[in-house]
Design a protein with these regions (language model features):
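Cysteine-rich micro-motifs
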Residues: 332-338
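Residue patterns forming the tRNA-binding/recognition surfaces of aminoacyl-tRNA synthetases
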Residues: 1-113, 168, 172-320, 356
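Acidic, glycine-rich two-metal-ion catalytic cores of nucleic acid-processing enzymes
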Residues: 117-121, 333
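Cys/His-rich Zn2+-binding cysteine-cluster or related metal-binding knuckle/ribbon modules and their
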Residues: 314-332
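Short functional micro-motifs and their immediate structural scaffolds
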Residues: 84, 254, 327, 341-344
Length: 357
């Protein structure tokens, strides 16, 4: 495996493969009848091209258009890397909707517990809230109350949020900000703690007793068994739903809170929208204008870092002595701030689509 041979030898092996098979791929393209200038080939890892990619990254970094932050990403626990929304493949699967009882800290209208509905009971270990729809008058009396989260004995609040569909499940939605994009948004809006219960392999981290060390499938079975044994499993429904899978290895993806590099799309899309809204750019047929506008308005910041070894390595350097950080067009092993020699480059590589822009 790549981990056994190390980064340098793995990259060397990738170059060997490129030199051996790159010409074959070009010949295949020719036989397909592609009419291109084959005397003007460009490989994305060519030195001059790599320098251009590096300069763009550094320019955007210094202009505040690229930043590092901790956010929810699509994570493959098998490939151990983030992947983009466009690289995720959706598959319809037969699953279940588990209805779990969460005890109230104080009775409400004679009720001692609420029932939350979830397709992912294993993530309840990281719940930090329960949400209801503002359009659901039957739940109004519960807003502002708290429940005692089973297993971990964590007291969490009940609140209203527009992300909740009052007609889905029980109307009570468990909120796990570190393991669901909608929950992350609700957590940001309501200032909820973010608790990551999985490591990069989707294995339960330390601090969860008998569940620690279980993979996500084992954890699901164990959590359901625990709820059954404690008479807190209300009922189970069959449910057809769509699950994201990795396009490389077909593993189910994990929405995972991790530190990554992002392009600040919100800062870039304004001029593109203004050009259309002002009439400077027009679409034919005109009906595509609304499609474009809706797409642009809903774009999220783009995760451009990948935890892989083959690709354009992110040109950000760090000093372990003084904390200096900067994006550089040339490598360095000396800190320009303190003169220290404990300088290392970011381990991540760029999403291939960044270098193809």
């Amino acid at each position: 495996s790549r981990l056994e041979i190390g980064r340098d030898k793995f990259v060397d092996a990738c170059w060997d493969w490129t030199h051996e098979y790159g010409g074959i791929i070009v010949e295949q393209i020719k036989r397909m009848g592609c009419s291109v200038d084959f005397d003007n080939e460009r490989f994305t890892m060519d030195e001059d091209y790599a320098q251009a990619v590096r300069k763009v990254f550094c320019d955007w970094y210094h202009d505040g258009l690229i930043y590092r932050g901790k956010r929810i990403v699509n994570w493959c626990p098998n490939c151990t890397t983030a992947i983009s929304d466009d690289e995720a493949e959706y598959k319809d699967e037969k699953g279940h909707l588990w209805h779990l009882r969460y005890p109230l800290t104080e009775p409400v209208n004679g009720q001692d517990y609420i029932v939350v509905a979830t397709t992912r009971p294993e993530t309840m270990l990281g719940d930090t809230g329960v949400a209801v729809s503002p359009k659901d008058p039957e739940k109004a009396a519960f807003v502002g109350k708290t429940v005692k989260l089973p297993i971990v004995d964590r007291e969490i609040p009940i609140f209203e949020d527009w992300h909740v569909d009052a007609n889905f499940g029980s109307g009570f939605v468990k909120v796990t900000p570190a393991h669901d994009p909608n929950d992350y948004a609700m957590g940001q809006a309501h200032d909820l703690p973010q608790i990551n219960i999985f490591d990069e392999h989707a294995v339960v981290v330390e601090g969860y007793g008998e569940f620690t060390g279980m993979n996500r499938d084992e954890c699901r079975e164990a959590v359901i068994k625990w709820f059954e044994e404690h008479d807190l499993l209300d009922h189970v429904e069959e449910l057809d739903h769509s699950v994201m899978h990795c396009y490389r290895c077909d593993s189910a993806l994990e929405p995972w809170l991790s530190e990554q590099w992002f392009v600040a799309v919100d800062k870039l899309k304004g001029p593109a929208l203004d050009a259309v809204n002002s009439g400077k750019v027009t679409f034919h047929p005109a009906r595509w204008t609304q499609t474009y506008t809706t797409w642009m308005e809903n774009l999220k910041d783009w995760c451009i870092s990948r935890q892989l070894w083959w690709g354009h390595r992110i040109p950000v350097f760090y000093c372990e002595d003084c904390g200096w950080e900067d994006a550089l067009t040339e490598d360095t092993d000396v800190c320009p701030k303190c003169g220290g020699h404990h300088v290392h480059q970011d381990e991540n590589v760029l999403d291939t689509w960044f270098s193809s822009q």
